Amino acid sequence: MLRLGITLLIGLLALPGVAVAEPPLIKPRLVVLTDIENEPDDTQSLVRLLLYANDIELRGLVATTSVHMKQGVHPESIKRVIQHYAQVLPRLRQHDRAYPDAALLLARVVTGQPGYGLQAIGDGRDSPGSELLLRELERPDPRPLWVSVWGGANTLAQALHSLKRTRPKAAVDAAVSRLRVYTISDQDDSGAWLRREFPGLFYIVSPGSYARPTWAAIHREIEGIDNQHVSNAWIVRNIQQGHGPLGAAYPDIAYGMEGDTPSFLGLIPNGLNAPEHPNWGGWGGRYELYTPRREDTDPDGFTGGVPVETETRPIWTNAVDRFRPVVPAAYGRPVKAGEREFNDALVTLWRWREAIQNDFAARLLWTTRAPAEANHAPVVRLAHATELHVRGGDWVTLDASPSSDPDGDSLSFLWLAYPEAGTLKAPLPLGTEVQARIGLRTPEVDAPATAHVIVQVTDKGTPALTRYQRVILHIEPKAP
């Protein structure tokens, strides 16, 4: 959640402080389409998602098919996980009263198209899932409607097919403009159809084979980094065993851990995520808007049998970050720059993975522990606005010292330049900065540019929890 502070210091001149009201948290609204029972990872992702039901409004949970499960849907499996959630709900509400009733969630479990792909959509083929999507699209709600697609997308395709057949074009365009879709690759042939038939549809996807998608970074073992937080041993110790009925409902891995989770990670209000700006990066990865070439999507690799079509227009898809992780230091500053630099699309997600996993583990502990016995995330606040207007060559002070921790834990700070999120070509002069308050001199520019700086604040509780604040520097050329 973006929070506003009170002052900006540039050079030696302090501008007058102006109190700014903290904006209310607006929960994203989400409908999930899941081919649950195709493999265990959908159940794994659902366990995690329910722990964030206080932060994300779950408007529908739709059981669907996919190329991996072409016939039959399993709403009963969704309901079974919600029943485990019901057992721990009283304890969760000790940590946050916003957790919804299990009965409310159960009432939002419906079935989608009973068959596979485009062959299961058309006139007269509406399903409870497609009807739910239509109702949500036409609700008088100013929030976008996010649809996370963990399997096939044909229930969404049916909803938009019916919308197009029964509403005037202006109403269709207005409804589509409110949609935000994130699909875990294309798991049936309706995804490419949706992108082609509705060119204005906001769509995040890594088309092509499963070898190259950004979402795979949630579980993939990356050479040269510490992968313990996605190991089987970590999952047993922190999730499955001794963590109550919801943790016990988390199944063992069959192929990859939680391949569907990236579709909602970017909606969690952590100060870093900016759902309307996939190119800014966040827990769900970073994506750029362009038309990918078919040959760059590994079309001959494994897709489960879904044909890889040529994209006809720009979509939000794989982007590349250049990233050098920090590593712990025994003396002096607590962290130092690592020796290895990484440069690919997977980096955009796994760079946050330790924090993602620790957050999951902490929330699962909420299901068995009283608030005084559990850890809660720090609250990151700035002593200035989140967007600063400066000129090239200015000295800028960035200050997160008003940050605090609800449990009274000690806090560690790390400031990160995120060049890929902005337009500034020159590097920011920012090293391994670990103080709450830092200064830097902005590069000189010939044209207006933006630079993103992230402050990462981590407590020293167990497990250690991290929150962020993003500062956007709007840099103008020096005055003539």
What are these regions (language model features)?
Residues 5-16:
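Bacterial N-terminal signal peptides
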Residues 22-397, 403-424, 448:
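N-terminal acidic, glycine/proline-rich low-complexity segments
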Residues 192, 476-480:
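Low-complexity, Pro/Ser/Thr- and charge-rich linker/hinge segments at domain boundaries
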Residues 416-441:
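Surface-exposed, flexible coil segments in extracellular/virion-facing regions
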Residues 441-448:
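Short, surface-exposed loop/turn segments at beta-strand-coil junctions that are enriched for proline
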Residues 458-464:
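Short, solvent-exposed loop/turn segments at the edges of extracellular beta-sandwich modules
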Residues 465-476:
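C-terminal edge beta-strand
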